[in-house]
Amino acid sequence: MTVAVFLAILCLRAALAAPRPDYSLDAEWEEWKRNNAKTYSPEEEKQRRAVWEENVKMIKWHTMQNGLWMNNFTIEMNEFGDMTGEEMRMMTDSSALTLRNGKHIQKRNVKIPKTLDWRDTGCVAPVRSQGGCGACWAFSVAASIESQLFKKTGKLIPLSVQNLIDCTVTYGNNDCSGGKPYTAFQYVKNNGGLEAEATYPYEAKLRHCRYRPERSVVKIARFFVVPRNEEALMQALVTYGPIAVAIDGSHASFKRYRGGIYHEPKCRRDTLDHGLLLVGYGYEGHESENRKYWLLKNSHGEQWGERGYMKLPRDQNNYCGIASYAMYPLL
């Protein structure tokens, strides 16, 4: 038994010692279970109900702070409502994501628009869900290659995340327990291709590598690490398209994010555990109000956040590590 699983069990056992259920929440609990297709054994229901009620309290507290203008983003009860903090951390990348300061192809006289959303060009595929598998790293890599493939061919083809999970173990990745986008890009480059989701579908678990060269739909010639600053990140995003990034996504507020610009006081720029796709930037309100944000695509399904996307503070000292681990491929 792994330490992470052992801790998760301890958290659930601790929930058993919680007070009896708040019966005033019965209807809300039953509705939440229906909406999220949750079924439990009688004993597990007691445990999950206790965890869920604690999360309800946390969300109410956050909402009250919003009313006092202490926050400017919202959170909500979603499919993760019955999960402990440790269980949610197991869904993120357990690998320590670090990179040396990189270089990228810098073009001169690049015009930087005030706002940018690569979704408007059609080069961003629909949001997908990683489920209970900690493969965010693979989703961000596949998504960045999808965008480059569209820019080159005009075809938006969802690529196989499962191909990356199964076939990068020999590169040091840990399948559903985390992996490094850098080594995933290395695999695609060295392997000479990557399959589509249609021929190598997602299973949310590790299986043996079943890649077949004749089914490959894309190759990458090389990939680049963006220097660790937001100015370089913006220039790369404008010039080359959506970028695979990583942030600190370890907080309960992240898993239950609903909308707005995500300000988490405990978010760190040197603790990176969740991969996303950077697709744009903008600002809320008037430009002079300095409410600037980065726009990111997550892999928790469309029910999470703003239809699967989130906004992260921009030009605020590399908030949550947005510029600490950024890469893009070229075909």
From Swiss-Prot:
Species this chain originates from: Rattus norvegicus
Compartment(s) where it occurs, according to its Swiss-Prot or TrEMBL record: Endosome; Lysosome; Cytoplasm, Perinuclear region; Golgi apparatus
Disulfide bonds: 133-176, 167-209, 267-320
Signal peptide (UniProt feature, chain positions): 1-17
Main location: other
SMART domains for this protein: Inhibitor_I29, Pept_C1
Protein name: Cathepsin 7
EC numbers for this chain: 3.4.22.-
Xref: Pfam families: Inhibitor_I29, Peptidase_C1
UniProt xrefs under InterPro entries: Papain-like_cys_pep_sf, Pept_cys_AS, Pept_his_AS, Peptidase_C1A, Peptidase_C1A_C, Peptidase_C1A_papain-like, Prot_inhib_I29
Family: Belongs to the peptidase C1 family.
Function: Involved in trophoblast cell proliferation and differentiation probably by affecting mitotic cell cycle progression. Proteolytic activity and nuclear localization are essential for its role in cell cycle progression.
GO cellular component, one term: lysosome
Propeptide segments, given as residue ranges: 18-111
Active site: 136, 274, 298
GO BP annotations, alphabetical order: cell division; mitotic cell cycle; negative regulation of mitotic cell cycle; proteolysis involved in protein catabolic process; trophoblast giant cell differentiation
Entry superkingdom: Eukaryota
UniProt GO molecular function: cysteine-type endopeptidase activity
Annotated glycosylation sites: 72
Sorted UniProt keywords: Cell cycle, Cell division, Cytoplasm, Disulfide bond, Endosome, Glycoprotein, Golgi apparatus, Hydrolase, Lysosome, Mitosis, Nucleus, Protease, Secreted, Signal, Thiol protease, Zymogen
Ranges spanned by the short sequence motif Nuclear localization signal, renumbered to the chain: 33-50
Gene3D superfamilies xrefs: Cysteine proteinases (3.90.70.10)
Main EC class the enzyme belongs to: hydrolase
